[in-house]
Amino acid sequence: MTDVETTYADFIASGRTGRRNAIHDILVSSASGNSNELALKLAGLDINKTEGEEDAQRSSTEQSGEAQGEAAKSES
């Protein structure tokens, strides 16, 4: 019973009067950032690789593919 009493005392001390105030708290905390900031951050992301990076990735992939092919031949 003491757990319930402590929870009740904490609820009374918080100043909330029910669920209707909880939604307001959630909306206020999520409104700190706006969509303009998000759009700018997303625009700053660079998902395109430069030509040098693509060539390096292709050559390493081709080399690993050749090594796997040779290993498969030696196992047979």
From Swiss-Prot:
A molecular function GO annotation: cAMP-dependent protein kinase inhibitor activity
Signal peptide feature range: none
Any Pfam family hit: PKI
Keywords: Acetylation, Protein kinase inhibitor
Domain of life: Eukaryota
Gene Ontology BP annotations: negative regulation of cAMP-dependent protein kinase activity; negative regulation of cAMP/PKA signal transduction; negative regulation of protein import into nucleus; negative regulation of transcription by RNA polymerase II; regulation of G2/M transition of mitotic cell cycle
Site keyed Important for inhibition: positions: R16, R19, R20
Other facts: The inhibitory site contains regions very similar to the hinge regions (sites that directly interact with the enzyme active site) and 'pseudosubstrate site' of the regulatory chains; but, unlike these chains, PKI does not contain cAMP-binding sites. The arginine residues within the inhibitory site are essential for inhibition and recognition of the enzyme active site.
Similarity remark: Belongs to the PKI family.
Protein name as catalogued: cAMP-dependent protein kinase inhibitor alpha
Gene: PKIA
